[in-house]
Amino acid sequence: GFVKILHSLIIISLLLMMTSGLQIYNATPVFGGKTGWQVPKWATLGGWLAGGRDWHFTVMWVFSFTLLIYGIYIFLTQRWKKRFFSQQDLKALQVGQNPKRRTYAWHRLIYTSIIPILILAIGSGLAMYQPAQLHWLSRLFINWQTLRTIHFLTVPISLLFILVHLIMGIRAGGLRLTRSMFRF
């Protein structure tokens, strides 16, 4: 129950942040300025720039704290030993004959690889949210446009992760397992 609730909160908050982020993008597009490609209204949340920012910055806290709680939970229960990519997984991918073991190794590799992307998304988001207070963080990204571009690029990477995570979950346990993640 607890992990399923966290899982659902992460997915819902990600979708809300993506759609509100697209509203922010429409106000000042990252690629091509104000004449750049515009996201269709139906794919955005917030109605205008300030509304998009309100949604984005509110949900950002839900997302970040949910990830933090999940991280603490994984650490305290020592589930990280089974969740993250290890030497045994590398061996299974290189020479392993057991297809299920290889699938789980791929799953852990994908699961582990999203961590730096999420840190980058949160770090770049915080740098834009409070650039004066977190000037040291903002400076790590060289300039404002680079910061915005990096933050924006974490979205398709996260979407790709969700898609691959979903497909691998279906391959490992079928639709029944995947559906069970959303039943409390």
What are the roles of these predicted feature ranges?
Residues 1-184:
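Membrane-embedded alpha-helical bundles that constitute the cytochrome b-like, heme-associated redox core
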